[in-house]
Amino acid sequence: IYARTDEQLAVFRRREVGLVYQFYNLVPILNVIENITLPVALDGRSVNEERLASLMRTLGLEGYGNRLPNQLSGGQQQRVAIGRALMNNPAIVLADEPTGNLDTQNSREIMALLESANRDAGQTLIVITHDEDIALSADRIIAIEDGRIVSDERIRA
């Protein structure tokens, strides 16, 4: 990775790493479909319509494709952000407080979607969270304080 150019690193990130942000980071002038397919567009590739339809179904976003982010609830916006992160079927999904701004029900649903990607697609899921219940659903918990690892515990084998 260190020998790659900035351009090669950008391509690697777009194709191999899916990012889910706490505050969604959706492009406000793009609709749901455009936001989800943004990594593909940035890569200059054509959209796999079957993959898009499958994601829209899985995320419960069918019928919302032409809506703008400001026309969606917080839970729906986070689902769009997850769709964008998963569109390229990345090897790694990094989720920074993916449920931080959501109510309990939406938090459960979002985590179920991420766990499904981990289980069904074999994607490595790394979640940063302050929510103990979410942390306890992991296979492994690494606690960090002041930039240092203070514990590393396997929950499941």
Language-model-detected regions and their locations in the chain:
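H-loop (His-switch) and adjacent beta-strand-loop-beta switch element
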Residues: I141-E153
